[in-house]
Amino acid sequence: MATWMNINLQDANSSTMEQLTMFHDHTLMILTMITSIVTFIMVSMTTNTLINRYLLEGQTIEFIWTTIPAITLIFIALPSLHLLYLIDEINNPEMTLKVIGHQWYWSYEYSDFKNIEFDSYMKPTNELMNNEFRLLEVDNRVLLPMNKQIRILITAADVLHSWAIPSLGVKIDATPGRLNQGSIKINRPGILFGQCSEICGANHSFMPIVIESVPIKNFLKWINKSLSS
């Protein structure tokens, strides 16, 4: 999760987020090189007193400063396109989670099992335990099994919302009258935090998302307990 004074990306909990982190580092390296070269050229131009009165054109240098940016853009575009198609792919999901955005809470349905659905509201400050986080904790967490391909179907009941979990590298828009889908595969157990990422009204800031990733045995126990109750 995001922590105080943290300027880095959150720890990746899915292969998608790992790929996004590597692409971020790849792009940042290229930008650092460009910034360094441009800074060096600007400093050289301001400090160099030499001139060339006979320079009318330079075909070679024009070819270089046209070709190098084109090659640089290719090195950025290819991994970017690869990631875009990778995020859109949904390969043989093992279960489906339905998400419905409301003002200002989330509803969840486990459509592979009967009668498992609930609403998830943010916990008010006066109900928080000592180990819970303000504005991020909810009354009903979403339990999901780790190392399983999960399809997310998402829509909204009123206005635009967006279901986002930064550590999973997922952000899916919830649009009224439209069903969007995405895919996640959590690769470690733990508690993952997210928030609504589309301004949806006065209480937009109070729509947290909490996912609890557990081993498949614990998940099945929770399913059986929910069905029996």
Swiss-Prot record:
Residues 1-26, 83-229 are mitochondrial intermembrane. It is a multi-pass membrane protein. Residues 49-62 are mitochondrial matrix. Its main location: mitochondrion. GO terms for biological process: ATP synthesis coupled electron transport. Cu cation A1 binds at H161, C196, C200, M207. Its cofactor is Cu cation. It holds the Pfam family COX2. GO terms for cellular component: mitochondrial inner membrane. Cu cation A2 binds at C196, E198, C200, H204. The keyword Translocase applies. PROSITE patterns: COX2, COX2_CUA, COX2_TM. Its EC number is 7.1.1.9. It catalyses: 4 Fe(II)-[cytochrome c] + O2 + 8 H(+)(in) = 4 Fe(III)-[cytochrome c] + 2 H2O + 4 H(+)(out). Keywords: Copper, Electron transport, Magnesium, Membrane, Metal-binding, Mitochondrion, Mitochondrion inner membrane, Respiratory chain, Translocase, Transmembrane, Transmembrane helix, Transport. It is found in: Mitochondrion inner membrane. Binds a dinuclear copper A center per subunit. The chain crosses the membrane at residues 27-48, 63-82. InterPro entries: CcO_II, CcO_II-like_C, CcO_II_C, Copper_CuA, Cupredoxin, Cyt_c_oxidase_su2, Cyt_c_oxidase_su2_TM_dom, Cyt_c_oxidase_su2_TM_sf. Mg(2+) binds at E198. PANTHER family: CYTOCHROME C OXIDASE SUBUNIT 2, CYTOCHROME C OXIDASE, SUBUNIT II. Component of the cytochrome c oxidase, the last enzyme in the mitochondrial electron transport chain which drives oxidative phosphorylation. The respiratory chain contains 3 multisubunit complexes succinate dehydrogenase (complex II, CII), ubiquinol-cytochrome c oxidoreductase (cytochrome b-c1 complex, complex III, CIII) and cytochrome c oxidase (complex IV, CIV), that cooperate to transfer electrons derived from NADH and succinate to molecular oxygen, creating an electrochemical gradient over the inner membrane that drives transmembrane transport and the ATP synthase. Belongs to the cytochrome c oxidase subunit 2 family. Component of the cytochrome c oxidase (complex IV, CIV), a multisubunit enzyme composed of a catalytic core of 3 subunits and several supernumerary subunits. The complex exists as a monomer or a dimer and forms supercomplexes (SCs) in the inner mitochondrial membrane with ubiquinol-cytochrome c oxidoreductase (cytochrome b-c1 complex, complex III, CIII). This is Cytochrome c oxidase subunit 2. The lineage of its organism: Eukaryota, Metazoa, Ecdysozoa, Arthropoda, Hexapoda. The gene is COII.
